């Protein structure tokens, strides 16, 4: 309140000074400023009062400029000092008025504020000297009224008020002055105390803002001080500061001996860089050449052979499609095309191991079954069929389904077109070449799709194994699907060899499971299946339980499909694998629908069989090939129609029933598998070899399958290519998972089949070995569970096979012994352990070479299994 009033009074001062009653006005003006109350004391203005006012004036002058500029920083308004000045010049009102203005100017007060203040006092006076006198809004005209009102000679009243207020004002001002001058106002007050002196003000400003040069000097001094102090405490610092160490080159620092090696190292590094650049350039050139070749080949194929594709393929390729007869009648040079595509794929992969490892290792299981299917048929028949619409259909549909799983339909159309264009061996291969990146992606992803794509494409060429089997068995189909599939599988196998990631192992396992699943349908289809089931690991694991092996492989197959479709398998752990599972689900659904819709169309063509394997591979990855193989075996010449029928059945069974088959599958597959069980065992051993790539246990089985020298050789090759480190790492993980799954499976089996303890015991041992095969594939360990349950049933049906398989499982321990010796020893051991809860443990030990894995599993699983048996 005081602030506002004082300001108003100060502004009103000029008007007051002009009037003759300046004294009176000053006194009332003061009274409102402090109390705003007029007391009825009729005392005239005293000399003491005048002195006090003068003193106040001085104090205000000292603070006036600051307060006015600060906007009454301390509650004292700048006008009040002005008023004080006016009072001091009681004798000469005019002089006081003039003085006030100069002060205002000196203080740097702005006129507008001054006007506002005058308004407020005038307003307060006009209203009867309102207590606040804070109405700044009143027009300036009120100033005259305010002057007149105070002009009334109420000098006594106003004089007394002024005296009283003077005292109060004095006290207040003193306090405020002290407050104003306090140190914490340093920023504002010191510079403004003497604002009247412009020079001083400028000096203050200069002091406040130091010039850059001065700041630089100060900073230098500060740093010097710091350094001098630091050097005293730590003299070593001085050397660094004052004599900064000069950087020495590596050559100067090294001794002569080291220097020489360093130079050599640099040279090697440079050479490497140059070589890498050259390699990159060469690779790029090769890729360009390959692309050109592919384009040329595709163009030639398109021109030579009209596109003849399955209904799905036709949808995408209607524009290119011409006549199916052309494709069938014109036989493309599949071998040459396939070779070209293989070369291209290998160069793309740029893997040190190249195709040999992938062939031996990734394609064996599946492709052997594929070859066996075709083997049932005369290879010549299959070739023409494959070359004809059949191959094209299979490749196109497979491509389409694969793409449906992994890629958009447009891509599938492109792949289908490539397949149709390349038709026959080349068609499938061109598809892989086209799909080359896709296959690689799938393989890298460790997706089930990759395995499926591989199955579909690998039909034609097995690279290592399939070539061996497919040459005699199914050249065209095997080559065709194997070509594209081979590349993907080889990529996968190489990845597995490198053991870059579990996902790779998983994908490899998926592939192996695919082979197993292929075997399972073959086993289901009986002896003809046995021929195809040669590569199937599951039955190799449980040769004694041919049915179990089949059911296992089937369940594995189902496992693979469900795991991919439903994300049950451990491979789902990887997001990529989970995505693969989703893709598989879509592929299975599409494949089932296409199978149902196109079964009739495909039955007319052998290509339908290929399509089905492609579709099935896409759906369940391995199941489709399995189903296809069995049918091929049943009606070798009529592979297409049987495959369609079987395919229609299997796709439906794969997702839902395969799981059931895993758990209860033995009942269904075992019957069909029983006849094929023994044969499957032999053929399965090769697949065991295929699995051996994944785990030594599988390798042992493959050795046991030395009976099938072809497969065993193939197995040995890829196995040798694999490094022990990778094997042990993947084996340990696989064995751990497999052991856990085995435990669960054994528990389930014991609970379900406690009624038949002895057969169960037999099954359990064979199961572990078999499970081992599956579990050797890290990705498939969990999937192995369902096969064991079928295995338990299987052993009763095929107890003889179990001993054989046991021998195969033991193979790792006694690789140098004869198969017969090992078989006998293992058989006797198994019989001894049949009723013992430690049977499973023994089997596990037999199949494993990894000491760590053996110890770990022996301790945990032996104890747990014993408890379960109890």
Curated annotation (Swiss-Prot):
Bias-annotated ranges (Basic and acidic residues):
259-274, 313-324, 595-608, 644-665
Modified-residue entries (Phosphothreonine), positions: 537
GO BP of this protein: actin filament organization; cell surface receptor protein serine/threonine kinase signaling pathway; protein localization
Where does it reside? Apical cell membrane
This entry carries the following GO cellular component terms, namely: apical plasma membrane; protein-containing complex; side of membrane
* Polar residues biased stretches: 133-151, 506-543, 755-774
Q: Does the keyword Phosphoprotein apply?
A: yes
Coiled coil region boundaries: 213-307, 720-755
Modification Phosphoserine, positions: 122, 152, 347, 472, 476, 528, 641, 730, 758, 789, 796
Q: How does it sit in the membrane?
A: Lipid-anchor; GPI-like-anchor
Instruction: Report where the covalent cross-link Glycyl lysine isopeptide (Lys-Gly) (interchain with G-Cter in SUMO1) sits.
Output: 174
Q: Where is the composition biased (Low complexity)?
A: 152-161, 275-302, 410-424
List the residue ranges of the region (PKA-RII subunit binding domain): 576-589
Q: Which GO terms describe its molecular function?
A: protein domain specific binding; protein kinase A binding; protein-containing complex binding
Q: Where is this cross-link: Glycyl lysine isopeptide (Lys-Gly) (interchain with G-Cter in SUMO2)?
A: 174
- Residue span of region Disordered: 14-43, 103-165, 233-324, 409-436, 506-577, 595-688, 740-814
Keywords (A to Z) from UniProt: Cell membrane, Coiled coil, Glycoprotein, GPI-anchor, Isopeptide bond, Lipoprotein, Membrane, Phosphoprotein, Ubl conjugation
Record's keyword annotation contains GTP-binding: no
Q: What is known of its domains?
A: The RII-alpha binding site, predicted to form an amphipathic helix, could participate in protein-protein interactions with a complementary surface on the R-subunit dimer.
Reported function: Binds to regulatory subunit (RII) of protein kinase A. May be involved in establishing polarity in signaling systems or in integrating PKA-RII isoforms with downstream effectors to capture, amplify and focus diffuse, trans-cellular signals carried by cAMP. Binds to and modulates the structure of the actin cytoskeleton.
Q: What is this protein called?
A: A-kinase anchor protein 2
Q: What's the source species for this entry? A: Rattus norvegicus (Rat)
